[in-house]
């Protein structure tokens, strides 16, 4: 959430940010509404002061035996007017809060200004795609032919955009989760967490999935609970309403969880394979940082995601998202994209974002500087990594002419010595 004081004191800064993000929100309209809120509060306070004076006068008249009827009539009118204004004030305050909650985060000055993904900027690349002497097959064809991915049974069990993983595929998913968590906890100093897969409305609001993106979420019909779209939600909200010590920053958490997404608005996109599913497994990284250190932490987190792909021998590139393509809560985002030979392009496999104090302000997560007032922490999140898209990349990049798939060497110990998946 944007700082209201920033809106009031530097409206031109917010106006430019909203324009760069193509949000369509009018700062002038917001300031007019907020002005009405402040005017109402002033008017109500003035009327309450008059009511207090009138009450004192009524008491004095009654003590002296004089007629207080005219003042009682005035007192009644004042009370009625205050009640009317209280109702209007409550509504205007709600409108101000709702409009404030609908504003995206302010982009960092290093973020390129652009309208959409076509204006993102590549900032790094690792590895060279293999030169194949045969036409590469898509991962879903490979996985199905090798007996590991079953889309037909998943469709009968549930519906479209689901998959059943069997045998080596289920084992590979488990191996990836263990490999990712081992790297994060043993080498990158993350604390592993096993959080609930359902969260309440307050938690979803804290990380800014609500109220804007409710249609993208799965909600339990009889409860005000939501299935998590990412472990970012429970991990970030671990410290909701808390004050951390400055000496405890940065804090880093990771978790492997299923993620549930309705994929509203994705009709026709990635209808085949395991790139875009309603349910998938992902290891998430979340960091709480000092405001002066958060962009250093973003570079660190990006490095953690890229290192996993390097160890898996998967060619990839890093891009900085432009203002028009960033997520709602992000001040700066790096997307890491892995090479998929069958699509002859790079596809997103990790997104690492610095949300500055945007989520912390909504979830009320603060820290206590030495000798100073409490301040909001900066929150960061990143994929480290999703198993589905990683399996897709392994299948496509490791495919051989005979139909087999060579596994990355780093996974062999996690697969009990299995080095390749052979045709049945």
From Swiss-Prot:
Annotated transmembrane regions: none
> A single GO CC term, please?
cytoplasm
Q: In which pathway does it act?
A: Aminoacyl-tRNA biosynthesis; selenocysteinyl-tRNA(Sec) biosynthesis; L-seryl-tRNA(Sec) from L-serine and tRNA(Sec): step 1/1
Question: Which Pfam families is this protein grouped with?
Answer: Seryl_tRNA_N (PF02403), tRNA-synt_2b (PF00587)
Q: Its catalytic activity?
A: tRNA(Ser) + L-serine + ATP = L-seryl-tRNA(Ser) + AMP + diphosphate + H(+); tRNA(Sec) + L-serine + ATP = L-seryl-tRNA(Sec) + AMP + diphosphate + H(+)
User: Where do the annotations place ATP binding?
Assistant: 261-263, 348-351
Which keywords does this chain's UniProt record carry? Aminoacyl-tRNA synthetase, ATP-binding, Cytoplasm, Ligase, Nucleotide-binding, Protein biosynthesis
Instruction: Give the EC number(s) under which this enzyme is classified.
Output: 6.1.1.11
| An example Gene Ontology biological process | selenocysteine biosynthetic process
**Where does the protein principally reside?**
cytoplasm
Entry domain remark? Consists of two distinct domains, a catalytic core and a N-terminal extension that is involved in tRNA binding.
Assembly, per entry:
Homodimer. The tRNA molecule binds across the dimer.
The protein's name in its UniProt record: Serine--tRNA ligase
């Amino acid at each position: 959430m944007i700082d209201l004081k920033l809106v009031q004191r530097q409206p031109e800064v917010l106006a430019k940010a909203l324009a760069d993000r193509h949000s369509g929100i009018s700062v002038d309209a917001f300031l007019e509404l907020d002005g009405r809120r402040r005017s109402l509060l002033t008017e109500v306070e003035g009327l309450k002061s008059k009511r207090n004076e009138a009450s004192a006068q009524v008491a004095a008249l009654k003590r002296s035996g004089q007629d207080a009827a005219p003042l009682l009539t005035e007192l009644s009118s004042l009370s009625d007017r205050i009640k009317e204004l209280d109702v209007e004030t409550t509504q205007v305050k709600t409108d101000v809060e709702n409009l404030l909650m609908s504003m995206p985060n302010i982009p960092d000055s290093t973020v390129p200004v652009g309208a959409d993904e076509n204006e993102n900027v590549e900032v790094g690349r690792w590895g060279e795609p293999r030169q194949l002497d045969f036409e590469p097959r898509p991962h879903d064809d490979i996985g199905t032919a090798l007996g590991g991915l079953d889309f037909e049974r998943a469709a009968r069990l549930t519906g479209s955009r689901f998959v059943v993983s069997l045998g080596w595929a289920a084992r590979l998913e488990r191996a990836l989760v263990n490999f990712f968590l081992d790297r994060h906890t043993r080498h990158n100093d993350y604390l592993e967490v096993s959080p609930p897969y359902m969260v309440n409305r307050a938690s979803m609001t804290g990380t800014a999935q609500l109220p804007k993106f409710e249609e993208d979420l799965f909600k339990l019909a009889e409860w005000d609970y939501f299935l998590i779209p990412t472990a970012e939600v429970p991990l970030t909200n671990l410290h909701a309403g808390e004050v951390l010590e400055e000496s405890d920053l940065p804090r880093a958490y990771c978790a492997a969880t299923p993620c549930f997404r309705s994929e509203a608005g994705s009709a026709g996109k990635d209808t085949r394979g395991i790139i875009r599913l309603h349910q998938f497994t992902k290891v998430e990284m979340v960091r709480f940082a000092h405001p002066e250190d958060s962009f250093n932490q973003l570079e660190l987190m990006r490095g953690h995601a890229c290192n996993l792909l390097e160890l898996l021998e998967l060619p990839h590139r890093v891009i900085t998202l432009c203002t028009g393509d960033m997520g709602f809560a992000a001040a700066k985002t790096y997307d890491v994209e892995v090479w998929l030979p069958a699509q002859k392009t790079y596809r997103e496999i990790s997104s690492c974002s610095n949300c500055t104090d945007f989520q912390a302000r909504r979830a009320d997560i603060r820290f206590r500087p030495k000798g100073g007032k409490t301040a909001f922490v900066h929150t960061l999140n990143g994929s480290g990594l999703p198993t589905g898209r990683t399996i897709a990349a392994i299948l496509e990049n490791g495919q051989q002419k005979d139909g087999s798939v060579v596994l990355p060497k780093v996974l062999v110990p996690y697969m009990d010595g299995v080095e390749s998946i052979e045709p049945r």
